Amino acid sequence: MKTRLLLFLIVIFTNIIKVNAQQGDVCFNDYFTDNTLRLDYIFAGDTSRQLIFVDELVKVKGWYGRRKRLELLPYEGNGQITLTDKASGKTIYRHSFSTLFQEWLSSDEAKTTPKSFENVFLVPFPKSTVDVKVELFDFHRKVSSTLTHTIDPNDILIREIQRPKNPIVTLQQADDTTNCIRIAYVAEGYKKEQMDDFINDAKIATEALFEHEPFTSMRGYFNIVCVESPSENEGTSTPHKKDWRNTTLGSHFDTFYSNRYLTTLHLKKLHDELACSPYEH
């Protein structure tokens, strides 16, 4: 049987979940444009020391994240990003995250061998200069590493992406696309001539999702697209079988030497394939 891999990028329910928190007072249009600032970082180190490095900044057409409660954290994570308006010192955006790097820190390998991991975070594109603070937390919720850097939105070295790299197929349009949950299926391990198979597999996965509550009754809140990113080889790599394949995202089993743990470490590639499609994380 041929192997098929479908990577899901499911956007958090930030736009429709009722958060029991104080209403935020940051107006999106006062501080941001309708674009995305992609923050590419390298997280590196071992159990004794973790470091954060800026890799690249990218401006992508369109912003598909939340536009309300911008300065409030929607959920806890193992790290967080805070944007502060440089002129006023006001916090204008916060978001939390959890990364594969931080998961790896719990492994035996992290005790003896320093490694680095790509990480990509999306924030709304600022109108004016901002300070960006990145914090990593340890297992006791203490800050283990932090980096603060300044971003001028007019910086000529911010790379711009204005159009999708791949064809985007809409499987289902939400009743209200300004207030919805966005799902993007990314083709990984499908050749160019297999895109019909990819779309069919995505449809099967979609129907399986909506067979269950609360998804069935909330179906109209979901906006679902497919990103047709072709691979040279079919399937995914399985290192413990010495089976390596050339795929768009370089995904493989055996992450952290666990046979069934399937991931991609190439997050910049993933976000390049997704660029300008309607997704948030």
Question: What are these regions, as identified by a protein language model?
Answer:
Residues 10-12, 30, 72, 112-114, ...:
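Sterically constrained small-residue positions within well-ordered secondary structures
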Residues 98, 241-242:
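Short intrinsically disordered coil segments
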Residues 97, 221-222:
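Sparse recognition of residues in long alpha-helices and their boundaries
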Residues 1-24:
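Bacterial Sec-dependent N-terminal signal peptides
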